[in-house]
């Protein structure tokens, strides 16, 4: 579980990824999220190496609001483990749908195709694209909403 004492390590993770976290407002929003939202951390050699924050929008759905692994720890399975842990815990609480937003395919790549890799990562974790949204809070960029069923279907 992410605790307030993990926040500086999460800030350092964000600082290690300037090609993903280049917008100062986004960096500030992420810093606030790791201090106030529910979240999870993964460690490597005893240090926080990755984090994920979630927000519950209603009793049956949640959103991954921020997720990152330190540049030196990317592609080691930490992100996948964080998603699976969060999904299992949320499902036990009755959440049935998990969503995440990332830059959509309509956004021109400026950083070496980083976000196509992000979209592929989420697809490999069972997320499917739902729709692209133009978000004013993202400087009018197009965000792709991806969703994944995680809990048991509701019975009537």
Go through each PLM region and give its residues.
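Conserved active-site tyrosine of GNAT-family acetyltransferases
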Residues: 122, 127
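Short glycine/proline-centered loop/turn elements that form peptide/ligand docking sites
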Residues: 115-118, 132-142
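A conserved beta-turn-beta hairpin within the catalytic core of GNAT-like acetyltransferases
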Residues: 56-67, 74, 93-97, 138
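Conserved beta-strand in the GNAT
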Residues: 41, 47-55, 63-68
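Conserved acetyl-CoA pyrophosphate-binding loop and the N-cap/start of the following alpha-helix
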Residues: 73, 77-85
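A short beta-loop-alpha structural element at the N-terminal edge
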Residues: 1-10
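Conserved GNAT acetyl-CoA-binding A-motif
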Residues: 90-114
């Amino acid at each position: 579980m992410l605790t307030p004492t993990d926040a500086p390590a999460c800030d350092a993770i964000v600082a290690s990824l300037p090609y993903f976290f280049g917008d100062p407002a986004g960096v500030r929003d992420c810093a606030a999220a790791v201090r106030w939202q529910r979240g999870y951390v993964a460690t490597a050699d005893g240090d926080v190496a990755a984090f994920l924050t979630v927000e519950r929008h209603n009793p049956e759905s949640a959103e991954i609001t921020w997720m990152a692994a330190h540049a030196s720890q990317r592609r080691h399975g930490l992100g996948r483990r964080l998603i699976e842990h969060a999904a299992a815990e949320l499902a036990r609480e009755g959440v049935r749908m998990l969503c995440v937003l990332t830059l959509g395919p309509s956004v021109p790549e400026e950083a070496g195709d980083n976000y196509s890799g992000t979209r592929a990562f989420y697809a490999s974790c069972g997320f499917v694209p739902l729709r692209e949204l133009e978000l004013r809070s993202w400087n009018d960029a197009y965000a792709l909403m991806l969703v994944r069923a995680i809990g048991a279907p509701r019975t009537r």
